[in-house]
C-alpha cells in the first residue's frame, strides 16, 4: 500500500499531481479526484492506482471532447471519429457519448435543425444537397426529415429563384436553349428538384434577346462551318447541324442561317 503524501494543483485548470510516499506518482483530473475521494493520507493499492489511471484516461478524453465542442456544434459521429483520432479505448466511447448527451452537449436532432436553418439563411442550397451533407455527418433519416420540414415550398422557390437568376447572368452569353439547360443543371447540382425549376421558370427565364441570339448564332455558325470543311455537301451540313445542336442552338434557327448563306 502507498499513501498519498501530497496533492498539488497543476497550472492547467482542473488537473492535479498526486504524490505517494513523498514522491510524484501520477496526475489526475479534478473529476477523478472527487470520484475516488483522493486526499492526503489516503492509502492506495496497485489495483486502485490502475483504476484511477483508467478513469483519468477517460476524463482526459472527455475533456478533449469539451474543447472540440467549444468551437461549434458537433454530431455524435463527429465525436466518435475524434475519439478514434486521439486513440481513445473503445470501451470509453459510449460512456463519453452518454455523458455528453446527458449534458445536452450533443444532439443530432438539434444539429440537423440548426444546420438547415443556417443554410436557408446564408446559402443557396436545396434540400437534396443538405440531406446528403447531413447523411455524411451520420445524422439519422428521421432527424434529417424533421429538419428539412423547414424547407417549405415557398422557401425552396425563393432560394431557387435567387440561384436561377444568378445562373442566368453567368450564362448570359450562351444560346437560349443551352442557357436554360445550364440553369436547370445548376439548380439540380445545388439540391433542387426539377419540379422546383418548373415552378419558378416563368419568373426567372429572361425575355429572349433576338439580336444577341442572332449574333451568337452567326459567330458560332461561322466557326463550326469552318471546322467541318473536310466534309462535302449533305454530309457537311449534317455534321454542322449536329455541332450547332450540341452547342445549344435551335435547329430551325441553324437551318435559317444555312439558307441565308451563299456558299458559291
UniProtKB/Swiss-Prot annotation:
<dbReference type="InterPro" id="IPR053924">
    <property type="entry name" value="RecX_HTH_2nd"/>
</dbReference>
<dbReference type="Pfam" id="PF02631">
    <property type="entry name" value="RecX_HTH2"/>
</dbReference>
<keyword id="KW-0963">Cytoplasm</keyword>
<comment type="function">
    <text>Modulates RecA activity.</text>
</comment>
<dbReference type="InterPro" id="IPR053926">
    <property type="entry name" value="RecX_HTH_1st"/>
</dbReference>
<dbReference type="GO" id="GO:0005737">
    <property type="term" value="C:cytoplasm"/>
</dbReference>
<dbReference type="GO" id="GO:0006282">
    <property type="term" value="P:regulation of DNA repair"/>
</dbReference>
<dbReference type="InterPro" id="IPR053925">
    <property type="entry name" value="RecX_HTH_3rd"/>
</dbReference>
<dbReference type="InterPro" id="IPR036388">
    <property type="entry name" value="WH-like_DNA-bd_sf"/>
</dbReference>
<comment type="similarity">
    <text>Belongs to the RecX family.</text>
</comment>
<dbReference type="Pfam" id="PF21981">
    <property type="entry name" value="RecX_HTH3"/>
</dbReference>
<dbReference type="InterPro" id="IPR003783">
    <property type="entry name" value="Regulatory_RecX"/>
</dbReference>
<dbReference type="Pfam" id="PF21982">
    <property type="entry name" value="RecX_HTH1"/>
</dbReference>
<protein>
    <recommendedName>
        <fullName>Regulatory protein RecX</fullName>
    </recommendedName>
</protein>
Amino acid at each position: 500500500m502507498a499513501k498519498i503524501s501530497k496533492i498539488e494543483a497543476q497550472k492547467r485548470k482542473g488537473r492535479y499531481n498526486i504524490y505517494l510516499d513523498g514522491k510524484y506518482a501520477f496526475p489526475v483530473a479534478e473529476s477523478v479526484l472527487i470520484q475516488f475521494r483522493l486526499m492526503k493520507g489516503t492509502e492506495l493499492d496497485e489495483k486502485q492506482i490502475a483504476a484511477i489511471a483508467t478513469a483519468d484516461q477517460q476524463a482526459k478524453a472527455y475533456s478533449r471532447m469539451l474543447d472540440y465542442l467549444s468551437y461549434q456544434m458537433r454530431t455524435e459521429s463527429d465525436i466518435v471519429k475524434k475519439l478514434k483520432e486521439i486513440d481513445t479505448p473503445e470501451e470509453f466511447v459510449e460512456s463519453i457519448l452518454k455523458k455528453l448527451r446527458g449534458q445536452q452537449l450533443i444532439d443530432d436532432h438539434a444539429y440537423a435543425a440548426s444546420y438547415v436553418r443556417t443554410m436557408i439563411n446564408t446559402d443557396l442550397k436545396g434540400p437534396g444537397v443538405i440531406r446528403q451533407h447531413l447523411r455524411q455527418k451520420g445524422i439519422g433519416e428521421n432527424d434529417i426529415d424533421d429538419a428539412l420540414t423547414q424547407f417549405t415550398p415557398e422557401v425552396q422557390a425563393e432560394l431557387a429563384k435567387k440561384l436561377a437568376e444568378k445562373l442566368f447572368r453567368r450564362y448570359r452569353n450562351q444560346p437560349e436553349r443551352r442557357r436554360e439547360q445550364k440553369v436547370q443543371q445548376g439548380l439540380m447540382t445545388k439540391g433542387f428538384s426539377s419540379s422546383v425549376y418548373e415552378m419558378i421558370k416563368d419568373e426567372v427565364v429572361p425575355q429572349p434577346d433576338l439580336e444577341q441570339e442572332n449574333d451568337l448564332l452567326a459567330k458560332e455558325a461561322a466557326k463550326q462551318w469552318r471546322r467541318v470543311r473536310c466534309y462535302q455537301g449533305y454530309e457537311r451540313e449534317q455534321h454542322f447541324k449536329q455541332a450547332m445542336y450540341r452547342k445549344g442552338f435551335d435547329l430551325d434557327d441553324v437551318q435559317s442561317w444555312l439558307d441565308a448563306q451563299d456558299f458559291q
